[in-house]
Amino acid sequence: MYNDHKLISSRPFATLQSGVNIEVKMKSKRQQKLYDHYKTVFGEEPIFSLKLKKNVLPTDMKPITTLVFKPTDEMPFWKLCTIGASDYLMPERDIGFGRKANRRNEYMMFISPDVDIRNPSDDEDAPTDWLSLNSLLWATAEYAFNEKDNITVSDTIDMGIDGKYCGAVLLLPEVFKTPKIVKCYVSEHKYISIFQVMPITRELLTKKLRKKVGGIYWLMEQFYTHDDDYKLISSKPFATL
């Protein structure tokens, strides 16, 4: 049901709030396709974007942008979506049964509508606590480049963070009624995978590890719960502060 998964330990995590500026223009054909893909899926333009400054990026890594989409009646939650992670072509990875993981990823995080998210460049009184969630999203997006690794759905990343969340698990974004969101085609046969980054607590990660082989299924079911026929029956896929 799930790919062969792995637990990943990341380099020490740093909050990147000071490395934020605003960027809207896309700089490549691939990035423009991603931008258009997000707009099509969400039915609107992002309300603002955040970009990692080059001085906080690993050497030779291209900048990563977060597009911020507001809650709507149809999708009543915040959507934070990356553009730029897929510029890195990940190494090949065998995921079993003769299959290989895709080699270009982008990432998205869904945040509760109760969280106050405003553009810090436009509003000097805007809260900044939500930027810690965006930093977790960026750290996930940086991981494959930093480690020269391939990450895919069901992987968990332990970032060694002190606080509410210690890392993240990669999920399929089942909150959407259509699976189209998970693939952005850049040509007829090539696509970018888009996975949901779900923050996890140290308690959840510890329980997952104790369950060993069945741990990843248990962990993923905490956010998207299925019946015996694997039909989605409930979901709690939103990050909170």
Explain the meaning of each model-derived region.
Residues 2-82, 87-90, 98-103, 108-241:
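Acidic, proline/glycine-rich low-complexity IDRs
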